[in-house]
Amino acid sequence: MLDREGYRPNVGIILTNNRDEVFWGKRVREHSWQFPQGGIKPGESPETAMYRELYEEVGLLSQHVKIVGRTRDWLRYDVPNNWVRREWRGSYRGQKQIWYLLRLTGRDCDVNLRATRHPEFDGWRWHQYWAPVDEVIDFKRDVYLGALKELSSRFLRGMESYEDFAARQLSGNR
């Protein structure tokens, strides 16, 4: 299901622990890492899609997390043509996403990457809040950074800004 502009509605999930570290999933049989995300089905609300994707990709249920916040608007990224299925070329531009910031209220052992028959991830780790941005595939990077910035400034009081984090990394003070 695409909107008029060629974007597929989607949700992204930034799952944090009590140390404000983020869940980082390793894609099955790949060396790439990302946040959980997935499409919104027709008739499904973004929140319902978020809980479905959270279970399908991470094995967590609503009782394992608390919604801290979500982005105000859709964040969009274009997918390069060489990444688009041949049958979609010409109509598909990319994804538009509502991002959710969640707090894990359960335990690490509640994570189950094999909750469904078609796992998205075969590994996971907790990561510093800002650190994953540089590891994201380049065409998604601005959306990831935009979501992390908006959600941290609105909902994570006292969180170091991305600019301060980046300056610290450049100076070698990790």
Swiss-Prot record:
Report domain Nudix hydrolase positions: 6-149
Specify one Pfam family: NUDIX
Q: Which GO molecular function entries does the Swiss-Prot or TrEMBL record give?
A: pyrophosphatase activity
Q: What class of enzyme is it?
A: hydrolase
Q: Where is this motif: Nudix box?
A: 38-59
Q: Does the keyword Nuclease apply?
A: no
Going by the UniProt record, its keywords in alphabetical order are: Hydrolase
PROSITE patterns per record: NUDIX, NUDIX_BOX
Q: Is Hydrolase tagged as a keyword?
A: yes
The Swiss-Prot or TrEMBL record lists the needed cofactor(s) as:
a divalent metal cation
Q: What is its EC number?
A: 3.6.1.-
Function in brief: Accelerates the degradation of transcripts by removing pyrophosphate from the 5'-end of triphosphorylated RNA, leading to a more labile monophosphorylated state that can stimulate subsequent ribonuclease cleavage.
Q: Which family does it belong to?
A: Belongs to the Nudix hydrolase family. RppH subfamily.
Q: What is this protein called?
A: RNA pyrophosphohydrolase
Gene encoding this polypeptide?
rppH
